[in-house]
Amino acid sequence: MDNYAVWGNPIKQSKSPQIHKIFAEQTKQCMEYKAILGDPEKFETELLRFFADGAKGCNITAPFKERAYSLADEYSERALTAEACNTLKRLQDGRLYADNTDGAGLVSDLERLGWLKSKQSLLIIGAGGATKGVLLPLLQAQQNITLCNRTLTKARDLADKFAPYGNIQAMKLSEIPVQKFDLVINATSLGLQGKTVDIEPEILRLAGAVYDMQYDKGKDTPFVAWAKALGVQNVHDGFGMLVGQAAHSFYLWRGIMPDIKPLLENDLI
């Protein structure tokens, strides 16, 4: 049986093992997928041991996406552009191949929701590894992006890096203008700590739609709950993005694209 896993910290909230179990059953693949709590002090050593022991691939979640990227030997274009990965695959010669399927998962979910329109104004909150993985696909979809972060330097560096691909500007979190954005995306991991983003509430009230890249299956994330409390009508968490990126990772590993509709339309997990 082929072994796979998702690495993160925290990790107990992850639904990835259940998702990939459903994918494996659906496509008749013989594989095992588990969740592993990564040790920040030993992450690289433990991950390399995981592959040395014969594992075929893994997903990477916060806070290890950039560190995992540095361990790879080959990269997809989207991983190279992001300089962060959420997927690793062990090649036949033992080398590691890095990909980033986050952007594909987000774009497919926004399209499913009908929230991805050309040349709309998009506010992204956070400039970490999760953001790096979605900027290229969003810019390729002709989004006009305002990227904000608590520290301006990090947002500016990222905006400068992606400027050749489309319209993107950087802004400090505390200086976001109170205006209507067609879509506001929370790309921070604050929800994992039970926290939400410190921005002017009116920005969410005015938004055409609000999307949280985090999820908490069975209940609202803090960001989603806050947006709903403010009266925002179009609000969604990142479960659809999770399922979408998982499907693209599964395809990279197994060579077959699973059907995500049963997971999104039925309460399977």
Curated annotation (Swiss-Prot):
What this protein catalyses is: shikimate + NADP(+) = 3-dehydroshikimate + NADPH + H(+)
Q: In which pathway does it act?
A: Metabolic intermediate biosynthesis; chorismate biosynthesis; chorismate from D-erythrose 4-phosphate and phosphoenolpyruvate: step 4/7
The UniProt GO MF terms for this protein read: NADP binding; shikimate 3-dehydrogenase (NADP+) activity
What cellular component terms from Gene Ontology apply here?
cytosol
Is Oxidoreductase among this UniProt entry's keywords? yes
Q: Name one Pfam family in it.
A: SDH_C
Q: Where is the active site?
A: 65 (proton acceptor)
Q: How does it assemble?
A: Homodimer.
Question: In which family does this protein belong, per the annotation?
Answer: Belongs to the shikimate dehydrogenase family.
What protein name does the entry list? Shikimate dehydrogenase (NADP(+))
Q: Which organism is it from?
A: Actinobacillus succinogenes (strain ATCC 55618 / DSM 22257 / CCUG 43843 / 130Z)
Q: Which gene encodes it?
A: aroE
